[in-house]
């Protein structure tokens, strides 16, 4: 089977959909990392970077192996880490992650709101 960017995104969407059905605390999920670039594969290997936002506390990180060459790297955060959203502009890890994110699961537009807040004035020196 030929691994393509589209196939990887489809796999990510299926995992998120399955998780959303199984976990009522899931508020949102977004894709980040190399899969959002032009060339996400290094050779024929890659990982799929996902961020899950939960209503409350949860485990921090998990790794799931889809195939020998493809892994899911899932970071879990409680919703309150993203509030207030404007503070994320100065956060080198989450700010960049959410700025470039591709929302996959966002029924209440939580990620949309956070992205709008982060992207506003993001490139000013104080941020």
Q: Residue locations for each model-derived region?
A:
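Helical scaffold of the NTase/Pol beta-like nucleotidyltransferase catalytic core
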Residues: 1-29
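A short linear-motif detector with a strong N-terminal bias
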Residues: 7-11, 28-32, 44, 51-54, ...
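Conserved NTP/Mg2+-binding pocket subregion across the NTase superfamily
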Residues: 4, 62-127
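Catalytic metal-binding acidic patch
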Residues: 32-77
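A generic local structural motif
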Residues: 14-18, 36-38, 59, 90
């Amino acid at each position: 089977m030929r691994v393509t960017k589209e196939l990887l995104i489809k796999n990510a969407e299926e995992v998120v959909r399955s998780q959303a059905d199984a976990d009522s605390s899931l508020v949102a999920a977004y894709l980040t990392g190399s899969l959002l670039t032009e060339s996400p594969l290094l050779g024929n290997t890659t990982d799929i970077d996902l961020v899950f936002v939960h209503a409350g506390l949860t485990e921090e990180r998990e790794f799931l192996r889809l195939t020998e060459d493809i892994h899911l790297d899932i970071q879990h955060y409680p919703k309150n880490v993203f509030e207030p959203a404007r503070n994320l502009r100065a956060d080198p890890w989450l700010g960049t992650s959410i700025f470039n994110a591709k929302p996959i699961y966002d029924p209440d537009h939580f990620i949309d709101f956070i992205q709008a807040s982060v992207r506003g004035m993001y490139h000013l020196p104080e941020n």
